[in-house]
Design a protein with these regions (language model features):
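Hydrophobic or amphipathic alpha-helical targeting/insertion segments
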Residues: 95-154
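Multi-bladed beta-propeller domains
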Residues: 19-34, 59-60, 67-83, 100, ...
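Blade-terminus and WD-like Trp-Asp/Gly-His loop motifs, strongest in beta-propeller folds
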Residues: 38-45, 86-95, 131-139, 216-224, ...
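Beta-strand C-termini and the immediately following turn/loop, strongest in propeller blades
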Residues: 47-56, 96-103, 141-147, 180-186, ...
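Active-site-proximal cap/loop segments of hydrolase catalytic domains
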Residues: 468, 481-680
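Beta-strand-rich domains and repeat architectures in extracellular enzymes and scaffolds
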Residues: 26-62
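Cap/lid segment of the alpha/beta-hydrolase catalytic domain
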Residues: 232-233, 284, 404-526, 533, ...
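Predominantly five- to eight-bladed beta-propeller fold
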Residues: 61-62, 145-195, 228, 238-243, ...
């Protein structure tokens, strides 16, 4: 790790001394981006999170900003080195509720937008989520974990006064007892609360040994709630079987609105208070199914699916302010689109420039909302800059309102990103991919190439900003990233080709992508490199077990042994039941055949492992198995462990820099050098 940090500092010093026009590692601290836009009830203004980096504390921070829907009068609502978010504008547009997180914890606040007065509503022991204003403006609802009594095993005698005994044993009787990014989970259940918006004690309105941690929506008369939870026997072993319930706040009665096998969530009440929308599907125990959009009466009767022919997952559906249709987003061929559907099922696409939520890798995804006059706002981005705020009205053309990173990115030469297609060598299936070439790319040169593979595996890359891709290109590499079979945004059949079959022919897809780029020229075929994280780490380890074509590889936060993974990952009940047709003790060879460790005897490629020390999604012992196997075989290898990092290995700015620095150093050690070997 020390050599990685020294390399980071060397990069920083070199970038400063030479004033490079390319993106430099320290520029990560200068990036700003937008998130979570919220449109006011009259459509006149938008509240959003303005995200930035804190170089002294090495943290991502966020404040709330306000901007008029025409782009004027941008100004901060909150300031400081804190994390303000989850903004919800009150029904009259005069107040905004939000959470503010500091080192002391996260609490709920209400701020008056005209005068700036701020009321701290809560002093709670746990963070809150899913804020929702009542239509009359008198209440706020939210989710929060309520502690339960921890199990014990045996009793100890009382320690003498002043004695310093060891901590008592920790007893686990839950299937999910720790989670990535959170560590060991406290004993308890997520419940729904309501609190007076003017101040007062929160009141718990759900109960039982069940989690109620999904969306919350108020009834039109502000006397009831629609909540989401898993209220079934053995709920923790059936993690996708959520339902929607109605809670009467006067009497406390709870009534099921949905009752089927599948993940119903995202409930919202129509502006006239007469109908519901939500998304979900009938669960068939597949590793991927597209989410579908439903509308129904308030009691769940007369349910119908609005877009049965849309072979894409519906995300974040919201009622239009006139109640005549629904806005939603969906991923399509790597891009994230905003669309409107009428209650008769007519689909209208509005924009395909949504994105920019991430900084590290070019994943699809976005955030949007709708307010009065059907004014919508969304996070807008592309491959050359992270998220800004765009807005429009109805189904009209949106306009980008902010340019948060202009001061930095207008003064950096970034790598342009080109979209391409290739036929897979396995079956001729069309595979979409993108190529980022250095800003000073010379077609007559011969460049090293990095194949960067996304995780998931059911996710998608697209033409979105990626600091990692830009830093690799700034170091002189051509970077290629693709959506092999199994990726989302191409329909259910494309994603389901790897169901109980991962990794498999996705290998052929990726090799075909590399072949296509090499065939175009300007690539040195003797300097090919491969890396990927999570599911991309699985495929990277699989690739070096199938071919010695790549000069070096970096396997980040992988699964190496499916038998150990499905029984020790944080969400074991899901992985064990949805990713394999049988349990590992019932079909050990089925798990082993798909494990990269089964191919380690073939590996000759110098391969580095890189994982966060607090990763509970693909735990460190997965990387350690591959590392030790390579060591025993005499293959050049190294194990980079990121202290304090979870599966989101680059969540802190310096961790992102350290990850990129380690990968570049490993490739440079093995002939990459990031240099263009001129053909002349």
């Amino acid at each position: 790790m020390r050599s990685v940090l020294l390399f980071v500092f060397a990069l920083l010093a070199g970038a400063t001394a030479h004033a490079s026009p390319r993106l430099a590692p320290e520029d990560i601290f200068r990036l700003n981006w937008a998130g979570d836009p919220r449109v006011s009830p009259d459509g006149s203004f938008i509240v959003y999170t303005h995200n930035f980096m804190d170089v002294m504390e090495d943290r991502r921070r966020s404040n709330l900003w306000r901007i008029d829907s025409d782009g004027r009068n941008a100004r901060p609502i909150t300031t400081g080195a804190v994390n303000d978010g989850n903004a919800r504008i009150g029904p009259k547009g005069r107040r905004v509720a939000y959470t503010s997180a500091t080192e002391a914890g996260a609490q709920l606040f209400v701020r008056w937008l005209d005068g700036g007065e701020t009321l701290q509503l809560t002093r709670l022991p746990r963070p809150v989520s899913n804020l929702a204003w009542s239509p009359d403006g008198n209440w706020l609802a939210f989710n929060m974990l309520v502690s339960a009594e921890a199990p014990t095993m045996g009793a100890l005698p009382k320690a003498p006064e002043g004695a310093k005994w060891a901590d008592p044993p920790s007893v686990v009787d839950r299937a999910v007892f720790r989670f990535d990014g959170r560590g060991e989970l406290p004993v308890g259940y997520s419940q729904v609360f309501v609190v007076p918006a003017g101040g007062g004690a929160p009141r718990q309105v759900t109960g039982g040994n069940y989690h109620h941690d999904g969306a919350i929506a108020w009834t039109g008369d502000s006397r009831g709630l629609f909540v989401t939870g898993i209220r079934r026997e053995n709920a923790e072993l059936d993690p996708r079987n959520t339902d929607i319930y109605r809670v009467d706040l006067d009497g406390g009665e709870l009534t099921a609105v949905t009752d089927r096998r599948g993940p119903d969530d995202g409930v919202r009440v129509s502006p006239d208070g007469r109908r519901l929308l939500w998304y979900g599907y009938d669960d068939r125990r597949l590793s991927y199914q597209r989410t579908r959009l439903y509308v129904a009466d308030l009691d769940g009767a007369n349910r119908r699916e609005l877009l049965p022919g849309l072979d894409r997952s519906v995300e974040n559906p919201r009622w239009a302010s006139d109640g005549r249709g629904i806005y939603f987003q969906y991923d399509d061929r790597g891009r994230t689109r905003l669309a409107h559907v009428s209650l008769r099922g007519k689909l209208t696409d509005i924009a395909d420039t949504l994105g920019g939520l991430g900084l590290s890798r070019p994943y699809s995804g976005a955030a949007f909302s709708v307010g009065g006059g059907n004014t919508f706002a969304f996070t807008s981005g592309d491959s050359l800059k992270p998220a800004d705020i765009a807005a429009g009205r109805g189904t009209g053309k949106p306009v980008v309102l902010t340019d948060l990173s202009r001061n930095l990115l207008d003064n950096r030469a970034l790598a342009p990103v080109e979209e391409m297609l290739v036929k897979s060598g396995h079956d001729g299936r069309e595979i979409q991919f993108w190529v980022a070439r250095p800003a000073d790319f010379d077609p007559a040169g011969r460049y090293p190439l990095i194949l960067e593979i996304h995780g998931g595996p059911h996710t998608a890359y697209g033409p979105h900003f990626s600091a990692e891709v830009q830093l690799y290109a700034a170091a002189g590499y051509v970077v290629v990233y693709a959506n092999p079979r199994g990726s989302t945004s191409y329909g259910e059949e494309f994603a389901q080709t790897i169901h109980h079959n991962y990794p498999s022919e996705d290998y052929d897809d990726l090799i075909s992508v590399v072949d296509a780029v090499v065939a175009q020229g300007s690539i040195d075929p003797d300097r090919l490199y491969v890396t990927g994280g999570s599911g991309g780490g699985v495929l990277t380890a699989w690739i070096v077990g199938r071919t010695d074509r790549f000069r070096a590889a970096v396997v980040a936060k992988p699964v190496i042994n499916w038998i150990s993974f499905v029984l020790s990952a944080d969400w074991a009940p899901y992985f064990a039941q949805y990713w394999f047709p049988a349990m590992p003790w019932e079909d050990p060879m089925g798990h082993w055949r798909r494990s990269p460790l089964s191919l380690v005897g073939n590996v000759s490629t110098p391969t580095m492992l890189l994982t966060g020390q607090e990763d509970w999604r693909t735990p460190m012992w997965e990387s350690e198995q591959f590392y030790q196997a390579l060591k025993l075989r005499g293959v050049d290898t190294a194990l980079v462990r990121i202290p304090g990092a979870s599966h989101s290995i680059a969540s802190r700015p310096s961790q992102l820099m350290a990850k990129v620095a380690a990968i570049l150093e490993w490739f440079d050690r093995h002939g990459g050098d990031g240099e263009n070997d001129d053909a002349a």
